[in-house]
Amino acid sequence: MASKKGPAYMKKDKLITSRYDITLKNPDPHVSDRTSLRLAFVSDLHDRDPRRLLRLLKKEKPDLILVSGDTLERCKEGYQGHTMSEIDSYQEISFFWTVFCNILKGVHSILKKFGIAHDEKIGYGRTFLKRASKIAPMYLSIGNHEWYLLPEDRRLIKKCGITVLDNEDCQTEVKGVPLRIGGLSTKHNLEWLKDYAKKDGRKILLCHHPEYYQRFIVKYGLDFDLILSGHAHGGQWRFFGRGILSPGQGLLPEYHHGVYGNMVVSAGVSNTFFIPRFGNPCELVMLQVHGPSR
């Protein structure tokens, strides 16, 4: 289904662009399979500074920008009645991830007292949405750091013409190629997902959680042409190409980075708070998508 054209490293910015050729398995009799779409896939910005990412997107000139969640940090405990236990009931946070985060929080607090560490500034998510939407049409799904959207978020999204897919799908056309794009949220709606899978045409699913692949898509035999996920942050620490830990899959996650059948998992374009990466650069994923040869 996919082949990788080695990542283009940006040594100064420490951000890479990973490239994949994607062949959609289902032919469309109404579309020439010679038509190739250039899709930018972004995941896990976490409200961080988007300037490096925006420079790459402008250079790549994609036909669409697809974002699979955690663009914004909207997970304040108690806001609009949301609680940690509520959101955790939808996802399976592993014991090892919880212990790992608690240890790092303690170390980070100590280092801050000695001026060795500091909290990274956030609040850049809306800047990214505003500027990236001028590069190409954007489709956005919801991740586990987006329990809610603020009124100013919604106003900007509407003004910029960004399509938010919160357990929803839509029909669009790119370069004469009809596509359905859907977004499965952390607070998942399985009835919608099953209905979406039955629809005709080529279907892309933005699904922040790669662990939902086995939990829902494989379990219920659902059919999608392409699934785009993030969340695992590439396994956080990667040795010999193997991710070590992810929030939803625990130790040695099965889906952490790369191509798994019809699913592409991004290592993400940023980090969550202070968690370091080793052997696991942040990445923008560029997809060259076309139909099967006849």
Q: What role is predicted for each listed range?
A:
Residues 1-38, 43-46, 51-52:
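Acidic, histidine-bearing metal-coordination/catalytic regions of metal-dependent phosphoesterases
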Residues 15, 23-40, 162-163, 170-182, ...:
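Beta-strand-turn-beta hairpins that frame and shape the catalytic cleft
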Residues 40-43, 64-70, 113, 137-144, ...:
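Active-site neighborhood of phospho(di)ester-bond hydrolases with catalytic His/Asp-centered motifs
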Residues 47, 72-73, 211, 234:
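Short active-site segment of divalent metal-dependent hydrolases/proteases
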Residues 51-173:
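Core catalytic region of metal-dependent phosphoesterases/phosphodiesterases
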Residues 59-60, 129-135, 196-199, 218-223:
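Short, conserved loop/helix-junction motifs that constitute active-site signature segments
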Residues 139, 211-294:
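Conserved beta-sheet core of the metallophosphoesterase superfamily
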Residues 151, 155-162, 168, 174-220, ...:
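Binuclear metal-dependent hydrolase catalytic cores centered on His/Asp/Glu-rich metal-binding motifs
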